[in-house]
Every structure is written in structure tokens, then in C-alpha cells.
Curated annotation (Swiss-Prot):
PTM characteristics: The active site is phosphorylated in presence of sodium or potassium and in conditions of higher pH. Not phosphorylated in presence of calcium ions.
Recorded superkingdom: Eukaryota
Ranges per topology, Cytoplasmic: 1-63, 112-282, 334-815, 870-885, 965-991, 1043-1091
Taxonomic source organism: Saccharomyces cerevisiae (strain ATCC 204508 / S288c)
Name the record gives this protein: Sodium/potassium exporting P-type ATPase 5
């Protein structure tokens, strides 16, 4: 590739620099390894590719945002309602609706502002300065001026300014948790070159360093290969910017098809029918439907008057149209969600976007990062193998820093490999190993000195410190997480580093916490070991070692630890033959040790080896000693292999229980991690994400359940869609792998949540239907990209969020049913009312416009809020997730809406006609839709009766929909008395109770207060008509109870006809049972038995 090409496209097409040697990379990008770029060339490239930033600060277009907030179906219905309210001079209702519109617009402004903060938080991650070589000279420049081809120098404490192909490394480690989510530093090696035919994930490209990663050790030099949005961190920023995707430019379609698709998308976005959460999309579609029904009803009214439209006909048409608009719906929805968000705070869940609350009820898949989310993000020693001594296991340790927690046991003589393949079952596990060790209560045929040698090595080949903070009385640690895990075990065995060296650690424990071993060994007033030299961990050799002088026996000792292959290459002997004498290490011995390494690795443990050697002053002269302490190769030769340790990042205590409850609630959990596949698989099995008995499943299923990021990314969309099951574990995955997983779930019509805490999780957090970030350890970027933040970083808190989401969805369904049933009742009632004609042949209002608004906005609003506060049903988390496609508008809800609406219409119409023709003379008068005159007495009194009936029926309906099937009088069948049960039902939700009482009482002043009654509401005080209102309200209650009784009988019959299927749904199965070969075999056996 020519320099010109490189300049123009910033190498965005080429992503395989890890497969090139340093010389090939320099030639490819057009730079000199020694001289770097010239000033002229760097300026030319800067002009061509742009500054090394993640884009300009996102500006908020307030006008566009306000327009976007107003121009959707729900808000437009509110605007129309507001206009109608002001048209009929109902200033209070108009003012309330205006306030709701303003709140919605304000929420939109706040959310857009937070979205801008998300991007700006990412942009601030980049390093402000960079050290580069140009014209053969080292200079410091602003990081935004770095261009592809620059030779960049980085050292400890620097933030890498761009993606680099490393050309020199010296003990170079970087923190890539921003990209991979893994907390352990990554050792880099410039000399590595990966094969072009093999797939290498971002986290495994050890010859590259990535923009915004922190240098934690050493120094390095590299060629800048990617800048700005083309870097790995830039790809995350680009994905967070989003794309409206409203304009279709599909080359496979004609311009006419693209135009039609674009028009549909733009219209849907304008009305809110194809954006937002499922509930908001459904409500937007409902609003559009109700809008056109309202228009149709208004036309019907005018048609009934032969389109002779005067002011009264227009008002009647507006009244009928208004009856179809649930004006208080958005008010109640917003307030209910706000209250729900406040409740969530007390359950350690912070809701950033109210929409996400109802979305949680539909979640059926959760994709979670591992490190720090499912696990503690800290390392813990789990198994130790010392040849001929046995295997030490550490269990029940919850605090990785606390050496006083956990049980230590010994499996004498057995290695991990032998123990895992033992069929006898009785291996003689010794509990309380520490007490037995110091009481010398161990089997006679094992040598305690083997453990003492290993423990000394583990303690001294280590620079981490573990101490008890006097101020907080808590155990703390400093150092590398791996070394901390080893040092905690050493402290647990009463042999901390400072006990042997005499070094002081900050806030170290008092004398009572000091080791019994150290008290036994250490001479008064002097340290046993004196530190001579250290060979630090090197990414090339993958080990470290320390040289100490033992003041007690006057010997020099070299203690080493590191990756197994690295340590074993330095060893020439071990104690593995008889546990007493040092014997040469043969190839067969190495293979035996390697089997144990694999055995520990298969349990998800990170395995390290330990070795040592010692010699006296008499065995070396001064020159030889100097060579040993200064020459790594000499010091780390002819070591004696001592044993292995397996450490791991333990799951959070509550994770397994949370996963089990998610499965019980019909929610699948997927682990997407940057860790190695063995570790990820073991943790997933430990917490229940994967089944432990994988041998019960076909190989195809097992291969689909567990994949690496490279394997998953290597599949086409069609191949992913053809998988029998989407991966439950993806190891070594990149940010784009997580995004692809979310996309795959969406193609399977799954409604998913994504949890995470790092910058690398941000794109998937944003793409998921619900993004859940961690509040304590989460980055600002992940929080800003999320919908929900867990304030305690507790995976189990997601259960609280899901439960609250389901409760809220249930309650939203209840008050939507209540409000829409009232709309149906009012609309039918007013349409039927067209048959009532006055003496001039004009239709008479059976309800006035203000009466309609009063019932919709005032009477129904507070009970609807009360329904939004209903407690969760006992079986809420035993049900399957809500259907995100159907949402709250199930067939049952739709039928209930019309059923209750028709019953209410009948009751109100009976009350109106009973009053008009039964109690009164039946005269309809003239001009009774405007101002009162003497001929309107009967109409005005009948309106009062109908108004009271509809008001009270609406309130009774609120109680009836608390449970969609149970009788209101049998809500709590466990109560010992029907009277107690009734009062328990009405008093259980006190807000709802007082709302209904207020609604009942409010009917009286509205009917009796002068001026307000006849001038505003167009009705008059009544007497005997109250009896009719009460009677037909009771009739409505009876009708509603009979309808629910019919529903119960119907569903009972359905269950009887589908008993086997119902039993299948109600049982709590292993979520993996459908894929088990043993289940398939059992099904075949059952079928054969039946036949």
C-alpha cells in the first residue's frame, strides 16, 4: 500500500497488523522505524485523516429535540386534548395537560443531554500528550496531532494515545480493562507475529497496544496504526453515536422501494410507532387508532344532523371525540413510573430512563460481563498441589483479602489429576489442615518440609502485601491481584512476607495476628531472610524470581514462580519420587505434572508453578555469587520444582442464587467475557449459567453453548441464526462480539438486557433493550450509556429490577384497562345518546363535555395512580416474561375493555332513561346543550343521575381490575372471614381506597354547588335520582362480577382440556432440559410405553 492510500483512509480497511513483522508494518504504513515521519509528512497526514480525537463535542439542537418530543402520537393526542379543553373553556384540564406536555419535553431534553455526556466522557479518556519520534528526534506533541506512521514512545503511567504495532517492549504491561473488561494487566511482546490464517481476538493481540489503555509496567515503542474513530476505542465511540437509520439506501432495492421504506420509517418515528420501548410503541399505535376513531365519531355526530353543523352540533362532536381520548393516561403513566423509579432506589437500582422500567418486564435474556459483575473481580487461591505431599483445597472464602476466612483441607498424597480420576470415592480428606499442620497431626508418610519449602517460596517470590487496616478493621491488600491471592494464602497459613523479611506493611496487624511459624523460626531481633536481588516478571519469560539470604542457616536461596511452561523449563529436579530426596526431572515426570496443570485449568483456574534452589557460601565464590545475583539465566537454572497453585476470580456470593431465580422466571443468562474459555466455562457452570452435566448433551449443543469470540465472529449471520442454541458463554470476546450477540438475540425476537461495567460494554449496553451498568466499579461511559445503574454492583439486584418491571407492567395493564374501558363506555353512551332529540330535532347531550372531561381527567386519574401502586402478585417471578410483541394489549385485556365498557354503558343509559322517563316527565326541551331554561329541567336532572352513575361505575371498575380474574370479594382466600377478606381487599392499597372514596364524595358538590352545576357541568341538583344512580352502580358491580365468573369458568375449562401442556408450563424445569439427550431418550421411552 502506498503512503497516499494510507493517508487517505487511515488504514481503516486493514486490521491485521498483528500478523505483520515490525519491518513489514513500517513498510506497509510508510514510515521509518528509526527516524519516524518528517514534519511535512505528518502535517500532510494530519490534514488527510483529521485529528486524533473521538469527534467534536456533540451539540444539542434544542429546536429539533422539542420538535421530536412534540411530534409523536401520544403527545399529539395530548395537544389535541389541550386544545379541546381550552375550546370548551376548561382551563384547569387544559392547564394540567399543558403541564404534562412540558414535563415530557423536559425529560427529552435531559435524556438528550445525558446522551451527549456519554460521548464526551469517552472523548476525555484519550491522553492529552504523546511522545513521538519525528525527523529522528523525540518530541512531545498534543495527542490529537498523532497520525498513522508516527513512532510513539510510552512508559509507566502513560495513557496510550493511539493503537500501536509495538516494535520494542521492555517488561511492558498494559491495563486493557476498558476494551476487554478483564482487570488483570496484559503483558505485551513486540516480537510476536500471529498467523494470518488464525483468528486472533483483540485481547489476544499481544504485539499491539490500544488507544486509551494505561501502561502499568515497563516501557515500549510502537508504530501508530490507527487513530481517532478507527482505533478500537474509537469503534466503541462510533457505535455510541448511533445512527437514525431512517433513510433506506439498500442497493438491492429500487429507488421507489427505498423511498417507500424511508417514508414508513420517518412517519413511524414522527408518530412514535417504531421507536422507544414496546409499551410506548403500543401506546403510540393506540393513540393513532383512537385519534382516527375520534375523528370518525365526530363525523358520525355531524352526519346524524345531516351535516347541519351549528355551534351545539360542533360541541357535541367534540364531546364524542374527546370521550375516546384517554387524556390522563400519559399523566398517570409518567407519575407511576416516577414513583416506581423512587421505589427502585431503595432496592439499589437507579433508573436513568423511565421507559426501561416497563421494558424490564419483557426481558427474556440477560447478557452479562463476567469480571466484576458475576464475579468479584479479585483473585483467590483455590487449589495447591505439592508433589508427594498432596492437594490443598481452600473453600468457603468470601472475602479475597481476609486470610481468616475459609476452610483449608488436605487430600494427602493425591494430585488433582489423581483425585479427579479416582473412582474409589474415599480419598481421606483431612479438614482443618492448618491446625493439623502445627499440631503435627498429619499422616506419617508425608513430609511437612515439602509444604514448608513451597510456602516459603510462595511468600518470598512475591511483593504483594496483605494487612488489616486499624481504622476500618478490614483486611486490605496492595499489589498485583495474582500475587495478592498467593500472599493471602501465605498469611492464612501464618507465614506472611513481612514475618520472614522483617519488613513493615502499612497498618499491619498487631502481634496477636503474627504467625506461629514465624515465631518459631525467627531469631529475636533479626529477620530470617535478607533480600539480595530480584528478577521481575517479564512478558517474554513469564516468570519472576527473588534471591534471599537466610540468616538462620546461612544459605542463599532463589525462589521463583510463573507460568507452568516457563517455570518447568528452568527445573532439573523435584521431590516427586519419594518426597524426601531431590531426584532428576524426566520427560515422564514433566508429563505427569502437565496432566495436573490441565486438570486445574479445566476447573477454570489460572495455574502458576513454583521452584527454588539453595546453596551455601562455601559452594560459590564472590564472582559466582555476583553472576548469580545479576544474571537471570544463571539464577533461574537448575531449580527444584515444588508445586502448583490454581487461583481464580470467585463468583459473587449471590450470583448462583440470582441465576437460578432468573431461570425460574423464564430468563436465560449469557456470559460474555474477555477471559479464557476454560475459566469462563468453569465459572459459568459454578453459577448455573451452564449445566454441569455437559455429557448429557450432544456435541453440537455443547459447541453452541460455549464459544470463543473468534469462533462466534467467524460465523455469518445465517450461520448464527442456524445454531440450535445461542452461546451461553462467549470467551475472549471483543466489544463488537457483544454487539453481534445482541443483534443475534434481536433476530430471534428476544428482548434482552445487557449488564456491564467497562467502557468496552458501552456499545452493547446501548444496543440492548435494557442496558444495566454497575454503579461502584462501572465507568462513567457505561453508566451514561445504560438505562439502569445498580448502586451496589450486585448481580442479584437485577432481580429487584426485573420484579419491579414486571410489577409495573402488570399495574400499567390494570390502569390502561380501567381508563380505556371508561373511554369505550363514554363513547358508546354518547353515540347511543344521538337518538335523544329535543323539540327542535337536535340531539341532546346525555353527558356534557365538562362531565366527560371530569370523569376522564379528575375522577379516573387518582384511582389509576392507585392501581399503579399495587403490590406485586405472589407468583410474579414464577411466570414467563411478558410478550414484548403483544405487550399489555393481550386478547384478554381487549375483550375486558369492551365487556366492562358495554356493561357500564348499559348501567349509565339505564340511569339516564330511568330518571328521564321514570322519575321525571320525559321532556327533552329545547336548546339544552347550551344554557339552562325551564324546558331543560328533566334533561339536566337526568344528566346528573347518569354523571353520578358513570363516576361511581368508573371507581368500582378500579377495584375490579386489581385482579383480572378473581372476584373482588375473594381476593385473599386465605382469610378466615368473608368480612375480614372484604376489608382487606379495600384497605390493602390505601392510596386506591382514598382515591375511590374521594371520587365517590366528589360527585355531590359538583351536582349541588350553584353556578358550577348548571353553568359549567350543565346539570341540576337531584333527589330520588340518587337511588337510581346507586342501584345501577350496584348493577354494574354485579355485572362485572358475573363477567369475571364466566371468565374463570372458561379458563378452568381450557386448563382441563390442556392439562398436560399446563402442567408442562407450570413446572419449574431445568432450563437446559430441552437440549439434553437424556431427556430426548426419556421422551422416546415414554412414547413407546404409551403405545
Amino acid at each position: 500500500m502506498s503512503e497516499g492510500t494510507v493517508k487517505e483512509n487511515n488504514n481503516e480497511e486493514f486490521n491485521a497488523y498483528h500478523t505483520l513483522t515490525t519491518e513489514e508494518a513500517a513498510e506497509f504504513i510508510g514510515t521509518s522505524l528509526t527516524e519516524g515521519l518528517t514534519q511535512d509528512e505528518s502535517l500532510r497526514r494530519l490534514k488527510a485523516v483529521g485529528e486524533n480525537t473521538l469527534g467534536d463535542d456533540t451539540k444539542i439542537d434544542y429546536k429539533a429535540m422539542v420538535l421530536h418530543q412534540v411530534c409523536n402520537a401520544m403527545i399529539m393526542v395530548l395537544v389535541i386534548s389541550m386544545a379541546i379543553s381550552f375550546a370548551v373553556r376548561d382551563w384547569i384540564t387544559g392547564g394540567v395537560i399543558s403541564f404534562v406536555i412540558a414535563v415530557n419535553v423536559l425529560i427529552g431534553l435531559v435524556q438528550e443531554y445525558k446522551a451527549t455526556k456519554t460521548m464526551n466522557s469517552l472523548k476525555n479518556l484519550s491522553s492529552p500528550n504523546a511522545h513521538v519520534i519525528r525527523n529522528g528526534k523525540s518530541e512531545t506533541i498534543n495527542s490529537k496531532d498523532v497520525v498513522p506512521g508516527d513512532i510513539c514512545l510510552v512508559k509507566v503511567g502513560d495513557t496510550i494515545p493511539a493503537d500501536l504495532r509495538l516494535i520494542e517492549t521492555k517488561n511492558f504491561d498494559t491495563d486493557e480493562s476498558l476494551l476487554t473488561g478483564e482487570s488483570l494487566p496484559v503483558s505485551k511482546d513486540a516480537n510476536l507475529v500471529f498467523g494470518k490464517e488464525e483468528e486472533t481476538s483483540v485481547g489476544d493481540r499481544l504485539n499491539l497496544a490500544f488507544s486509551s489503555s494505561a501502561v502499568v509496567k515497563g516501557r515500549a515503542k510502537g508504530i501508530v496504526i490507527k487513530t481517532a474513530l478507527n482505533s478500537e476505542i474509537g469503534k466503541i465511540a462510533k457505535s455510541l453515536q448511533g445512527d437514525s437509520g431512517l433513510i433506506s439506501r439498500d442497493p438491492s432495492k429500487s429507488w421507489l422501494q427505498n423511498t417507500w421504506i424511508s417514508t414508513k420509517k420517518v412517519t413511524g418515528a414522527f408518530l412514535g410507532t417504531n421507536v422507544g420501548t414496546p409499551l410506548h410503541r403500543k401506546l403510540s399505535k393506540l393513540a393513532v387508532l383512537l385519534f382516527w376513531i375520534a375523528v370518525l365519531f365526530a363525523i358520525i355526530v355531524m352526519a346524524s344532523q345531516k351535516f347541519d353543523v351549528d355551534k351545539r352540533v360542533a360541541i357535541y362532536a367534540i364531546c364524542v371525540a374527546l370521550s375516546m381520548i384517554p387524556s390522563s393516561l400519559v399523566v398517570v403513566l409518567t407519575i407511576t413510573m416516577s414513583v416506581g423509579a423512587a421505589v427502585m432506589v431503595s432496592r439499589n437500582v437507579i433508573v436513568r430512563k423511565l421507559d426501561s422500567l416497563e421494558a424490564l418486564g419483557a426481558v427474556n435474556d440477560i447478557c452479562s460481563d463476567k469480571t466484576g459483575t458475576l464475579t468479584q473481580g479479585k483473585m483467590l487461591a483455590r487449589q495447591i498441589w505439592i508433589p508427594r505431599f498432596g492437594t490443598i483445597t481452600i473453600s468457603n472464602s468470601d472475602d479475597p483479602f481476609n486470610p481468616n476466612e475459609g476452610n483449608v483441607s488436605l487430600i494427602p498424597r493425591f494430585s488433582p489429576y489423581e483425585y479427579s480420576h479416582n473412582e474409589d470415592g474415599d480419598v481421606g480428606i483431612l479438614q482443618n489442615f492448618k491446625d493439623r499442620l502445627y499440631e503435627k497431626d498429619l499422616p506419617e508418610d508425608i513430609d511437612m518440609d515439602l509444604f514448608q519449602k513451597w510456602l516459603e517460596t510462595a511468600t518470598l517470590a512475591n511483593i504483594a502485601t496483605v494487612f488489616k487496616d486499624d481504622a476500618t478493621d478490614c483486611w486490605k491488600a496492595h499489589g498485583d491481584p495474582t500475587e495478592i491471592a498467593i500472599q493471602v494464602f501465605a498469611t492464612k497459613m501464618d507465614l506472611p512476607h513481612n514475618a520472614l523479611t522483617g519488613e513493615k506493611s502499612t497498618n499491619q496487624s498487631n502481634e496477636n495476628d503474627q504467625s506461629s511459624l514465624s515465631q518459631h523460626n525467627e531469631k529475636p531481633g533479626s529477620a530470617q531472610f535478607e533480600h539480595i536481588a530480584e528478577f521481575p516478571f517479564d512478558s517474554t519469560v513469564k516468570r519472576m524470581s527473588s534471591v534471599y539470604y537466610n540468616n538462620h542457616n546461612e544459605t542463599y536461596n532463589i525462589y521463583g514462580k510463573g507460568a507452568f511452561e516457563s517455570i518447568i523449563s528452568c527445573c532439573s529436579s523435584w521431590y516427586g519420587k519419594d518426597g524426601v530426596k531431590i531426584t532428576p526431572l524426566t520427560d515422564c515426570d514433566v508429563e505427569t505434572i502437565r496432566k495436573n496443570v490441565y486438570s486445574l485449568s479445566n476447573e477454570g483456574l489460572r495455574v502458576l508453578g513454583f521452584a527454588s534452589k539453595s546453596f551455601t557460601k562455601d559452594q560459590v565464590n564472590d564472582d559466582q555469587l555476583k553472576n548469580i545475583t545479576s544474571n537471570r539465566a544463571t539464577a533461574e537454572s537448575d531449580l527444584v520444582f515444588l508445586g502448583l497453585i490454581g487461583i481464580y476470580d470467585p463468583p459473587r456470593n449471590e450470583t448462583a442464587g440470582a441465576v437460578k431465580k432468573f431461570h425460574q422466571a423464564g430468563i436465560n443468562v449469557h456470559m460474555l467475557t474477555g477471559d479464557f474459555v476454560g475459566t469462563a466455562k468453569a465459572i459459568a457452570q459454578e453459577v448455573g449459567i451452564l449445566p454441569t452435566n455437559l455429557y448429557h448433551y450432544s456435541q453440537e449443543i455443547v459447541d453452541s453453548m460455549v464459544m470463543t469470540g473468534s469462533q462466534f465472529d467467524g460465523l455469518s449471520e445465517e450461520e448464527v441464526d442456524d445454531l440450535p442454541v445461542l452461546p451461553l458463554v462467549i470467551a475472549r470476546c471483543s466489544p463488537q462480539t457483544k454487539v453481534r450477540m445482541i443483534e443475534a438475540l434481536h433476530r430471534r425476537k428476544k428482548f434482552c438486557a445487557m449488564t456491564g461495567d467497562g467502557v468496552n460494554d458501552s456499545p452493547s449496553l446501548k444496543m440492548a433493550n435494557v442496558g444495566i451498568a454497575m454503579g461502584i466499579n462501572g465507568s462513567d461511559v457505561s453508566k451514561e450509556a445504560s438505562d439502569i445503574v445498580l448502586s451496589d454492583d450486585n448481580f442479584a439486584s437485577i432481580l429487584n429490577a426485573v420484579e419491579e418491571g414486571r410489577r409495573m407492567t402488570d399495574n400499567i395493564q390494570k390502569f390502561v384497562l380501567q381508563l380505556l374501558a371508561e373511554n369505550v363506555a363514554q363513547a358508546l353512551y354518547l353515540i347511543i345518546g344521538l337518538v335523544f332529540r329535543d323539540e327542535n330535532g337536535k340531539s341532546v347531550f346525555p353527558l356534557s363535555p365538562v362531565e366527560v372531561l371530569w370523569i376522564i381527567v379528575v375522577t379516573s386519574c387518582f384511582p389509576a395512580m392507585g392501581l399503579g401502586l399495587e403490590k406485586a402478585a405472589p407468583d410474579l417471578m414464577d411466570r414467563p416474561p411478558n410478550d414484548s410483541e403483544v405487550g399489555i394489549f393481550t386478547w384478554e385485556v381487549i375483550i375486558d375493555t369492551f365487556a366492562y365498557g358495554i356493561i357500564m354503558t348499559g348501567s349509565c343509559m339505564a340511569s339516564f332513561t330511568g330518571s328521564l322517563y321514570g322519575i321525571n316527565s320525559g321532556r327533552l326541551g329545547h336548546d339544552c346543550d347550551g344554557t339552562y331554561n325551564s324546558s331543560c329541567r328533566d334533561v339536566y336532572r337526568s344528566r346528573s343521575a347518569a354523571f353520578a352513575t358513570m363516576t361511581w361505575c368508573a371507581l368500582i371498575l378500579a377495584w375490579e381490575v386489581v385482579d383480572m380474574r378473581r372476584s373482588f370479594f375473594r381476593m385473599h382466600p386465605d382469610t378466615d372471614s368473608p368480612v375480614k377478606e372484604f376489608f382487606r381487599s379495600i384497605w390493602g392499597n390505601q392510596f386506591l381506597f382514598w382515591s375511590i372514596i374521594f371520587g365517590f364524595v366528589s360527585a355531590f358538590p359538583v351536582v349541588y354547588i350553584p353556578v358550577i352545576n348548571d353553568k359549567v357541568f350543565l346539570h341540576k341538583p337531584i333527589g330520588a335520582e340518587w337511588g337510581l344512580a346507586i342501584a345501577f352502580t350496584i348493577a354494574f358491580w354485579i355485572g362485572a362480577e358475573l363477567y369475571k365468573c364466566g371468565k374463570r369458568r372458561y379458563f378452568k375449562t381450557q386448563r382441563a382440556h390442556n392439562s398436560e401442556n399446563d402442567l408442562e408450563r407450570s413446572s419449574k424445569h431445568d432450563p437446559f432440559e430441552a437440549y439434553s439427550t437424556s431427556t430426548t431418550l426419556q421422551s422416546e421411552i415414554n412414547i413407546s410405553v404409551k403405545h
